[in-house]
Amino acid sequence: MESEGKIVFTEEQEALVVKSWSVMKKNSAELGLKLFIKIFEIAPTTKKMFSFLRDSPIPAEQNPKLKPHAMSVFVMCCESAVQLRKTGKVTVRETTLKRLGASHSKYGVVDEHFEVAKYALLETIKEAVPEMWSPEMKVAWGQAYDHLVAAIKAEMNLSN
């Protein structure tokens, strides 16, 4: 939701996101890896989008380059969600957003890829905090993800 260019993220949504992220933060490397393994299980061809996985004989989950990448993606998604209400916008550095837009565009990321990643992210969070998970938490994380994706897509369109 947006109001005059500012994202509306309720206090309740913020509380759900902050509470769950505070529990997940310490395991962000493992959770990031789980997120990417889920993405690859749902859409195996996405592995080819990563140069370090494309021709590697090593299984993705054992690839030494995947874990740090996966962790940085997971942390960025979560930190962006936590800041959403406070700032009223996606708070990823502009240079990072530009880079994300350019790389997602270059590797042919389309709407379906973002949808797979959203599903995988929500499932990863649900499994990480099962005792906290609720329909409201799913909506909160889903909205936060959608705002991040909208910001990345805006940069993708600029880089085309």
UniProtKB/Swiss-Prot annotation:
CDD domains: class1_nsHb-like. It comes from the Eukaryota. GO terms for biological process: cellular response to hypoxia; response to hypoxia. Keywords: Cytoplasm, Heme, Iron, Metal-binding, Nucleus, Oxidoreductase. The keyword Ribonucleoprotein does not apply. It holds the Pfam family Globin. Heme b binds at S51, K65, H69, R99, S103, H104. Binds 1 heme group per subunit. Induction: By low oxygen levels but not by cold, dehydration, heat shock, wounding or oxidative stress. It catalyses: Fe(III)-heme b-[protein] + nitric oxide + H2O = Fe(II)-heme b-[protein] + nitrite + 2 H(+). Its cofactor is heme b. The keyword Cytoplasm applies. One of its GO terms (molecular function) is oxidoreductase activity. Its EC number is 1.7.2.-. Expressed in roots and rosette leaves. Homodimer. Phytoglobin that reduces nitrite to nitric oxide (NO) under anoxic conditions (e.g. during flooding or in waterlogged soil). May not function as an oxygen storage or transport protein. Has an unusually high affinity for O(2) through an hexacoordinate heme iron because of a very low dissociation constant. This is Anaerobic nitrite reductase AHB1. It comes from Arabidopsis thaliana.
